[in-house]
């Protein structure tokens, strides 16, 4: 038995297919979902979702949102999402490097909003690079 998985962003449906397993970045840690999972509603953090439609895994960068699981249906509503196989790694590396520099600079700032935005941008850039298949150690 398999799951029906849908990843829906405001501007597009990123994934709509059957899957055997899903791993999501919840706000309290990684969340694994298999067929027969108990009903669930959970907040999602910025991070990488992994979905296994067969024997291979597909990575999707999620920009935060919510997941609802019920009767082997997994509906993921997100602020933004991007499949890892569509991400330009060079561009993602460059974006992460710039986000890291901005984060380092913001740590000296008194402006809480600036620090928050720098942290958010860093997490998003890191998730995109990880979803592309690159190992990120920062």
Swiss-Prot record:
Domain of life: Bacteria
Entry keyword set: ATP synthesis, CF(1), Hydrogen ion transport, Ion transport, Membrane, Thylakoid, Transport
Primary subcellular site in the record, as a coarse category: membrane
Annotated InterPro entries: ATP_synth_F1_dsu/esu, ATP_synth_F1_dsu/esu_N, ATP_synth_F1_esu_C, ATPsynth_dsu/esu_N
Membrane topology, record value: Peripheral membrane protein
Reported function: Produces ATP from ADP in the presence of a proton gradient across the membrane.
Assembly information from the UniProt record: F-type ATPases have 2 components, CF(1) - the catalytic core - and CF(0) - the membrane proton channel. CF(1) has five subunits: alpha(3), beta(3), gamma(1), delta(1), epsilon(1). CF(0) has three main subunits: a, b and c.
Family: Belongs to the ATPase epsilon chain family.
Protein name: ATP synthase epsilon chain
């Amino acid at each position: 038995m398999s799951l029906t998985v849908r990843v829906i962003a405001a501007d597009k449906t990123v994934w709509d297919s059957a899957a055997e397993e899903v791993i999501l970045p919840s706000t309290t840690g990684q969340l694994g979902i298999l067929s027969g999972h108990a009903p669930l509603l959970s907040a999602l953090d910025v991070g990488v979702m992994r979905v296994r439609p067969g024997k291979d895994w597909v990575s999707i960068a999620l920009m935060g949102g919510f997941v609802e699981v019920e009767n082997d249906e997994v509906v993921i509503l997100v602020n933004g999402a991007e499949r890892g196989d569509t991400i330009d790694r060079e561009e993602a590396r460059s974006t992460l490097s710039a986000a890291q520099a901005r984060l380092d600079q913001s740590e000296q700032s008194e402006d809480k909003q600036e620090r928050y935005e720098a942290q958010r941008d860093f997490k998003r850039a890191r998730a995109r690079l990880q979803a592309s298949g690159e190992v990120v150690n920062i």
